Every structure is written in C-alpha cells, then in structure tokens.
C-alpha cells in the first residue's frame, strides 16, 4: 500500500487583483486536479512537490474572487496549517491592506507559518519598494518578491513553508513541478538589484512609526 502523502491546508489571501489565482494556476497538476467547494465558494488546488524526504502536498485554498465583496468567512481559514498573503508591488493599497489579511488569518489560525509575497515584480513600474516592505519583519513572516506570470520564485514560498512544517531546514525540492510556460520574462539584472535592495533594507532598523513611509 502506498504511504500517505503529508498534505497541508494552505490559505492564499490578499486583495482582489493581486494575482493569487494566476499564481496557483501555474502549477499544472494542481490546476488539473482542483476541486470547487460550492458551500464556501473556494477552489482547492492540490499542489504536489517532491522533496529529498518524499512527496509533500499543499491543498491551496483560493478564494475565487470573494474578497472583492468584503472579508472572508471563518470557514475559509479553519484548520489552515500555513498561509500565503499576496500583494501587488505595482499597487500601494494592496500592501497597505496586508495587516488586515494577516489579522484575519491569525485570529483563526494562531501560530501557523506565513509567507508574504509581493507579486508582479516583472512590471517595470514598481510602486512598493524594498524599504517600504517591513510588515513581515514585525510579524516574523518570510518575504519573497515573485512574478506569477514568469514563474519567478514560484517554488520559494512553498519550500520555506515545507521546511517549517516538516521542522527540517535540510528539506529540499528534488524535482521541479510542471509549470505553465512563462507569459512574460523577468529582467534578471533587475531581479538581482531588487534582491540586493531587500537585503540592505532588512539590515536597517525597523521604523518606529507604523508604515510611515506608505
């Protein structure tokens, strides 16, 4: 009998239009096997990753756009074991709303590992710069710049969460999942520049005022 694959419920939250559905749909098997839960209006995408300790699966709960009509129901968050909060680096308001998403999530699921992702870094008109992104440091979250449409850093949030959930920093992905072909290309030099800016910003002390520079 095949061993049971460790499976974790992952809630994906953030303002409408930040690219959450685009992001989760990059993983082709998850997109093929997704299930719709009509009672709470959610699509669940089972995303499998292969690690040096065997297969791991994230059941990614995607809101199917409900967040545009106000907050999400508790049923969405209940029993979540990890989370991704997404904002759009070309839209300041989506970053400004991150604390609300975080508050709703931790109110229901207290001590779960959470990754904050700034999506759309492929777009040249970046509005939310590295020095502004401090929320993850205040709340002990992990942060990654991502670009769903180019697959840039797609695996990073999942690898960080998998290590946290397994309690093993040595865990690694040994094979890449089948991803949809990139719709856009990222500028590698610009990505390196963003990464350096993020490293420099992380070395600075946190501002006293809450998000005074927003």
From Swiss-Prot:
Region (Switch-I): 34-42
Binding locations of GTP: 15-22, 65, 119-122, 147-149
Molecular-function annotations in GO: GTP binding; GTPase activity
Domain of life of the organism encoding this protein: Eukaryota
Keyword terms, alphabetized: GTP-binding, Nucleotide-binding, Nucleus, Protein transport, Transport
CDD domains referenced in this protein's UniProt entry, alphabetically: Ran
Name of one Pfam family that matches: Ras
InterPro entries given in the database record: P-loop_NTPase (IPR027417), Ran_GTPase (IPR002041), Small_GTP-bd (IPR005225), Small_GTPase (IPR001806)
Principal cellular location given in the protein's record: nucleus
Domain Small GTPase Ran-type: residue ranges: 4-168
Location in the cell: Nucleus
Family stated for the protein in its record: Belongs to the small GTPase superfamily. Ran family.
Subunit structure: Found in a nuclear export complex with RanGTP, exportin and pre-miRNA.
Stated name of the protein: GTP-binding nuclear protein GSP1/Ran
Organism of origin: Eremothecium gossypii (strain ATCC 10895 / CBS 109.51 / FGSC 9923 / NRRL Y-1056)
Gene: GSP1
């Amino acid at each position: 009998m095949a061993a049971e694959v460790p499976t974790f419920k992952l809630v994906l939250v953030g303002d409408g239009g930040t690219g959450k559905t685009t992001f989760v749909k990059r993983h082709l098997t998850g997109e093929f096997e997704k299930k719709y839960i009509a009672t709470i209006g959610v699509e669940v995408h089972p995303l499998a990753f292969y690690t040096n300790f065997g297969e791991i699966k994230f059941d990614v709960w995607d809101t199917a756009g409900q967040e545009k009509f106000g907050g999400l129901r508790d049923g969405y968050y209940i029993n979540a074991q990890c989370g991704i909060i997404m904002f759009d680096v070309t839209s300041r308001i989506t970053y400004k709303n991150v604390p609300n998403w975080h508050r709703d999530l931790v109110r229901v699921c207290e001590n779960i590992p959470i990754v904050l992702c700034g999506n759309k870094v492929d777009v040249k008109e970046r509005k939310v710069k590295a020095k502004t992104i401090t929320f993850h440091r205040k709340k002990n979250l992990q942060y990654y710049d991502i670009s769903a449409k180019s697959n840039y850093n797609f695996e990073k949030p999942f690898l960080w969460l998998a290590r946290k959930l397994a309690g093993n920093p040595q865990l690694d992905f040994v094979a890449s999942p089948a991803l949809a072909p990139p719709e856009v290309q990222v500028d590698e030099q610009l990505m390196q520049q963003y990464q350096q800016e993020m490293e420099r910003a992380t070395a600075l002390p946190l501002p006293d005022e809450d998000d005074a520079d927003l």
